[in-house]
Amino acid sequence: MSQSANDPQFILIAPPTSNRVAFFQQALARLQLSPARVISYLDLLAGRITLPQIMDSNSLLRLESPGKDFAHEQALLELGAQVEEVENYARISVDEVRQLSFEKGRLLWPRQWYLGFRAALRLIEGQLLDCAKGEVMNTPRDIAVMFDKPRCHELLRDHHIRVPRSLGTIRSFEELETQMHDHHCSRVFVKLAHGSSASGVVAYQTNGRQHQATTTVEMMRHNGEWRLYNSRRLRVYRDQHEIAALINELCRHRVHVEQWLPKAGLDGKTFDLRVVVIGGKAYHVVARLSPSPITNLHLLNKRREVEAIQQRMSNAAWQTSMQTCERVMRLFPGSFYAGIDLLITADYQQHAVLEVNAFGDLLPGVWWQGQDSYTAEIKAMLARTSRCSLLARI
């Protein structure tokens, strides 16, 4: 298909080698659209390029995850070291950040990383104010909220979206035990406040005598201190002292703690749903089945089409659950898409929102009306921006 001067130019802010960039470029190619221009966060942070220099009326800006790239992680940690932290969470200096070397799976000061990422988002937001034209798929402000689990949870709760009960601010294992006792809660999820992809997630349960923590986190001692590493292999800790050490270390970087709600079962496993909402409508839905409490697909859990689940639920219950996901996105008016983690209760009749994922739309091999999520987003974005003649051509 020949290109027109008025055709859209997608601009991606992302690590250039990200698989997300590759998948998005493939979707554009399938639609016979021009490849996206890729700008790294590193170039923006260094001032080598600015958005007003490159955006015009045909520009469609998409922010992608800066994750899985050590240079980006290091840059955001360095930026976070320069942000004032009033809550006294763990941090390291700019010089210490520069001395870091890559260690596969290591959790590196996630609170400080978030402060840096939020500062980068604010830089982008400021540059967008100086852009006279162009569209943004998801605004930096919305992304910052989605990446702050306590703040996002509070937003949903305040707008009457059902979420698991929060146990409030926790700064230590001792505080966790006290809060669980006071809330009459024997099972909780402890999550890094700014983690993603099950990073730093602990499913903890106790009856007061016995303790069990299921987690993706491996603990290792180094020079008298704990280092935490993410792993695809789930670990189960039963020693209270080990669990206390794990929780205390996570608390140094800010955590979100919520009640562990029972999930529905299917094929001898429990599951939750990942729902991709695009332009206000629930599109792609996939069930994530796991024998453990943690269902993330990258942990080699099984995915399942949702027809069997729809058959178990009443039509009204299914429609209501999808409508809830669409309601969630109305709380993020600057966001065109997101991935929502949805719990279905054991009786298949109720649901609760577990998380809102700014970059939760990557679901390779999951289709909606013959389209993957990126293709659906591109076509829906073109429709929203009134490029109907282009849609007719593709």
Question: What is the role of each PLM region?
Answer:
Residues 2, 122-254:
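Active-site nucleotide/adenylate-binding loops and adjacent lid/helix of ATP-dependent enzymes
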Residues 6-11:
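Extreme N-terminal starter segment of soluble prokaryotic enzymes
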Residues 15-27, 31, 36-170, 174-175:
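Conserved N-proximal alpha/beta basic substrate-recognition cap immediately N-terminal to
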Residues 17-19, 68, 194-197, 262-263, ...:
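Short, solvent-exposed loop/turn segments at secondary-structure junctions
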Residues 188, 256, 283-284, 352-354:
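Protein kinase-like catalytic core scaffold
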Residues 207-327, 366-370:
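ATP-dependent carboxylate/phosphate-activation module, predominantly the ATP-grasp catalytic core
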Residues 274, 341-343:
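Short, surface-exposed charged micro-motifs
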Residues 297-337, 344-394:
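C-terminal active-site "lid" helix and adjoining low-complexity regulatory extension at the edge
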